[in-house]
């Protein structure tokens, strides 16, 4: 009986030591992270911009940014999208009622103004458009939108 008791105690002690070592491995200090890299910030902007695009722009400009022939212009590699950010921001804020010509094709549907969107939302969606559908351009910032909004009122 004593022998069984000693074996049992030894077994319990061995289990306790093994548990303690496993526990120490789990609680080992980890590296602390510093400020997130800019790519993480761009990723967040793109995710937010995609949500705005899906709720505001998708119907006219389509999921692939290709637009609708002779009605709604494409957002793929055009000077409107990749060019002057001020013009693009103004277009978002004020809309457009006259036809627009892109690559020798005229588009006739008016674009409604989207001034109800916040500076952040406009910056996010324009950054999304400028970096989706095969586009590659600099981000639009909320500060840039705020500046243009103040001028076009």
Language model regions located:
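Extracellular low-complexity Ser/Thr/Asn/Gly-rich intrinsically disordered segments
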Residues: 25, 30-37, 84, 88-91, ...
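Sequence/structural segment immediately N-terminal to covalent heme-attachment motifs in c-type
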Residues: 42-68, 81-94
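Electrostatic cytochrome c docking/interface patches
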Residues: 25-52, 148
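Short, solvent-exposed mixed-charge patches
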Residues: 21, 152-153
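Bacterial Sec-dependent N-terminal signal peptides
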Residues: 1-26
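Axial heme c-ligation environment in periplasmic c-type cytochrome domains
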Residues: 69-76, 97-152
């Amino acid at each position: 009986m004593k022998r069984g008791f000693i074996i049992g105690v030894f077994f319990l002690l061995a289990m306790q030591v093994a548990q303690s070592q496993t526990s120490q491995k789990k609680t080992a200090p980890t590296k602390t992270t510093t400020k997130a890299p800019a790519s993480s910030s761009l990723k967040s902007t793109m995710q937010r911009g995609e949500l705005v695009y899906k709720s505001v722009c998708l119907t006219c400009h389509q999921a692939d940014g290709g637009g609708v022939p002779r009605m709604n212009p494409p957002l793929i590699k055009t000077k409107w999208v990749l060019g002057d950010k001020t013009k693009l921001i103004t277009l978002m804020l004020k809309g457009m009622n006259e036809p627009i010509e892109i690559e020798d094709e005229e588009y006739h549907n008016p674009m409604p103004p989207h001034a109800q969107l916040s500076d952040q939302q406009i910056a996010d969606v324009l950054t999304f458009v400028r970096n989706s559908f095969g586009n590659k351009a600099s981000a639009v910032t909320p500060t840039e939108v705020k500046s243009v909004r103040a001028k076009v009122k």
